[in-house]
């Protein structure tokens, strides 16, 4: 409804504008809004900041211009072709460039339009003028009434907004946001991060290519600096950042505010202050960084949300799960679900894991303990694919998982939490867990049902619509368990799930873990809270300096002299004498 209302209002605005220059401005505003949406699809949702969207924009512009000049191709066909060229360029660019992260990715993206600028100049395309076709004005989009350009640009923008809206609400959009929030956690939850990023840059390239193609039709002249120049990429980035990254309306807000302002100032003051358009965008980005770092949309939304929260009654917090549980039947002779066989891993001269072998049986709770730096988290990273062992095997029901990606191991049935909690903070509690459910869900509706069930099991169903970033430490720990649980794991790896919790909170989380184990889920837990671990686990594995120090029942391990000397310490010996 909002999109329709915006389209009607913007379309009617063109009716009341007579001056051709202002109609031109009204026509290019949607073009830059589409460019902002294209940038946003990649950088706003997935978090991979691009300084190179001018590459797709310029290729689209030259595609339309060259096709019309050499083959007489109508822009009605040329613009879809420009979108295809942009999509192909996005895929070709993405395959090697996604090997990079952070500012390395951004700088690599910057290289593509700069290279293309010189390539097209070298090819002799310093300035291409689209041939005039007055006798076939409609076929070649050369209208005497410039309002038609406004309405066509608006139609393209509405299409891009509808597409973005569909992406935003789909598995595609949720996966991209999860990647933006925490790529490692997303992959551990079963998301094929590279595949989704390639889809994002392909779709982003298509939108940018279409925008470039229409831009060429409106201006009738294409030059390398105008379509491949740094200001093109900067405008796409700035209109999105000004309005709000990772949102449908952010790029539209940015384009509606900044494009008319920069163009009008350029017309009025361009002779006095050359390059004033760049000044406008520069001031805009500085202002938004200082006053609204996430953009106008998020600033307004946060203000409205805070006001509503102040008026609303305080909702009940996590429902504690401390009811009496049926005694869990231990099965020391159960089938082996997971096995680490002679695994070793070194980082330079440091051997973090040395020839470690452990077996985990179906339905048991195995505790892994040891001093800091013993190799516990490294072992977990070997078990769920974040690092590859230098030697040895990682076996899930006799299938070797060594070298598999975390999303593959998650899909095979291994869930994981992290030592430092890694929620998707800008997503709701329910959305966090839905992301974890996607890996084995039959449909989006099924993923939601599975997520709600997982939240109910950990006592967070009442917090489903709350932003994950507002949860307490205990709730975040439970949220990670729920997200891992939503993937229907056979083996659950819990990395210091009790860290930072008070005594009462520890009991609540232990109750949840016991409940899951009673359902037949096999659990391996790393923890330093020994009093709780002794009551929780069936068996201990003790690591020290990367090697296996001891293995056995809790009552045996807590009396083992070597374990006391290496880890538990004299206080434990005295307290339990």
Describe the predicted segments one by one:
Residues 168, 178, 191, 230, ...:
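Residue-level marker of regulatory loop/turn positions in helix-turn-helix DNA-binding domains and
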Residues 20, 26-28, 83-85, 127-129, ...:
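Intrinsically disordered, low-complexity segments enriched in polar/charged residues with Gly/Pro
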Residues 299-344, 572-577:
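ABC-family P-loop ATPase nucleotide-binding domain
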Residues 11, 100, 161, 226, ...:
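Residue-level detector of alpha-helix boundaries and kinks
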């Amino acid at each position: 409804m909002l999109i329709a209302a915006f389209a009607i209002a913007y379309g009617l605005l063109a009716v009341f504008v007579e001056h051709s220059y202002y109609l031109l401005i009204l026509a290019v505003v949607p073009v830059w809004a589409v460019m902002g949406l294209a940038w946003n699809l990649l950088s706003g949702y997935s978090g991979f900041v691009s300084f190179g969207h001018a590459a797709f924009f310029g290729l689209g512009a030259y595609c339309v211009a060259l096709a019309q000049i050499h083959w007489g191709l109508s822009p009605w066909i040329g613009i879809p072709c420009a979108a295809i060229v942009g999509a192909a360029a996005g895929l070709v660019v993405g395959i090697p460039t996604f090997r990079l992260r952070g500012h390395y990715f951004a700088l690599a993206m910057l290289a593509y339009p700069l290279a293309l600028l010189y390539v097209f100049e070298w090819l002799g395309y310093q300035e291409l003028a689209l041939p005039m076709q007055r006798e076939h004005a409609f076929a070649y989009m050369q209208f005497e009434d410039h309002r038609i350009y406004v309405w066509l640009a608006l139609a393209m923008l509405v299409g891009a907004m509808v597409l973005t809206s569909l992406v935003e609400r789909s598995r595609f959009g949720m996966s991209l946001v999860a990647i933006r929030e925490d790529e490692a956690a997303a992959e551990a939850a079963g998301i094929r991060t590279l595949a989704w990023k390639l889809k994002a840059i392909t779709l982003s390239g298509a939108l940018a290519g279409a925008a470039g193609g229409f831009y060429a039709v409106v201006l009738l002249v294409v030059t390398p600096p105008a379509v491949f120049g740094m200001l093109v990429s900067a405008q796409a980035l700035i209109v999105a950042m000004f309005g709000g990254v990772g949102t449908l309306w952010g790029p539209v807000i940015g384009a509606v505010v900044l494009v008319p302002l920069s163009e009008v100032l350029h017309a009025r003051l361009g002779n006095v202050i050359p390059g004033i358009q760049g000044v406008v965008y520069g001031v805009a980005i500085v202002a938004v960084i200082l006053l609204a770092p996430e953009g106008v949309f998020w600033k307004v939304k946060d203000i409205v949300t805070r006001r509503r929260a102040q008026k609303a009654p305080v909702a009940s917090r996590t429902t504690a799960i401390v009811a009496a549980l049926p005694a869990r039947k231990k099965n020391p002779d159960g089938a082996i679900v997971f096995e680490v066989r002679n695994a070793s891993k070194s980082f330079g001269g440091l051997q973090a894991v040395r020839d470690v072998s452990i077996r985990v049986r179906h339905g048991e709770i195995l505790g892994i303990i040891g001093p800091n730096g013993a190799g516990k988290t490294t072992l977990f990273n070997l078990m769920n694919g974040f690092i590859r062992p230098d030697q040895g095997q990682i076996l899930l029901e006799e299938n070797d998982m060594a070298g598999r990606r975390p999303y593959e191991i998650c899909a095979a049935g291994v869930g994981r939490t992290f030592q430092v909690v890694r929620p998707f903070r800008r997503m709701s509690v329910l959305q966090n867990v839905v992301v974890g459910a996607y890996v084995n869900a039959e449909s989006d509706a099924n993923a939601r049902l599975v997520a709600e069930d997982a939240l109910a099991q950990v006592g967070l169903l009442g917090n489903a619509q709350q932003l994950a970033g507002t949860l307490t430490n205990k709730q975040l720990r439970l949220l990670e368990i729920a997200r891992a649980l939503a993937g229907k794991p056979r083996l659950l790896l819990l990395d210091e799930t009790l860290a930072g919790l008070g005594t009462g909170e520890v009991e609540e989380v232990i109750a949840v873990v016991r409940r899951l184990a009673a359902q037949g889920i096999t659990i391996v837990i790393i923890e330093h809270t020994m009093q709780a671990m002794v009551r929780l686990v069936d068996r201990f594995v003790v690591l020290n300096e990367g090697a296996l120090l001891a293995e056995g029942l809790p009552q045996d391990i807590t009396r083992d002299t070597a374990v006391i000397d290496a880890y538990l310490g004299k206080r434990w010996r005295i307290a339990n004498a």
